[in-house]
Amino acid sequence: MIKKLFTLFKLGRKLAKSDVLNILSKFKKPPVAIKILFHILSFSLSRSQKINLNVSEGAKLSKSLQSMGTTFIKLGQFLVTRPDIIGEELAKELESLQDRLPAFSLYEAKTIIKKDLGEETFNSIIDLSEPVAAASIAQVHKAKINDNGTIKDVAIKILRPNIKKTFNQEIDALMLFAFFIESFVKKTKRLKLIEVVFLLKEITNLEMDLRFEAAAANEYAENTKNDAGFRVPQIYWNF
């Protein structure tokens, strides 16, 4: 419980440091208790980011959420599907939220691969490139692999360092926050905020298990193998 409260405090500071609450207030007024809480949390903080004043409020909000990392990006994307919680106008504005974050280093990528696959399998990977795409959960590298003596071009998707631990700590703290909101602001109970956060946790944890994505690609390849014009990347399960 104390750990969750501490994580919630850190998230609150992160939110308070951004422009999220000010931007949200232009769409929907938050409860007074929330405004007071964020005012307290923002004590001694200076704004860490300068947002272009010439862009829309939705673009500003998307940029703020992106700056706060994976958990808030996923939360924003999920809330787009719940206009009953955030309102039609805000849901429409958040459609522009992009699932992008700065890439982590090639050195970190190699360290993760070696730890997960072992030295022998790692040595079968040749010419691992710098990241070619980076999102909130994982990033992609081009590479060549030695598959039983045959050199093949592949793309390797690697989860961000400590992403599962970080996300689950933050989402559990947000679930605690949802519990507080439902307990003290009675009219929010109809929104089932705890269920919303729990569902987001389940969906994102499934997304972080790349075996499901690989299995889906395999199934799609099998279903379209006789269809002209379809080419599905092969999954190398031995890696």
Language-model regions, residue ranges each:
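Conserved ATP phosphate-binding architecture of protein kinases
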Residues: 139-147
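Conserved ATP-binding/catalytic core of the eukaryotic-like protein kinase fold
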Residues: 152, 162-167
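N-terminal accessory/targeting segments that precede structured cores
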Residues: 1-139, 165-193, 197, 204
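Conserved HxN/HPN-centered segment at the entrance to the catalytic loop
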Residues: 189, 225-236
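Glycine-rich ATP phosphate-binding loop
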Residues: 142, 152-159
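Residue-level signature of catalytic and energy-coupling elements of molecular machines
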Residues: 76, 140, 156, 213
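Structural motif at the C-terminus of the N-lobe alphaC helix and the adjacent alphaC-beta4 loop
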Residues: 177-186, 203-228
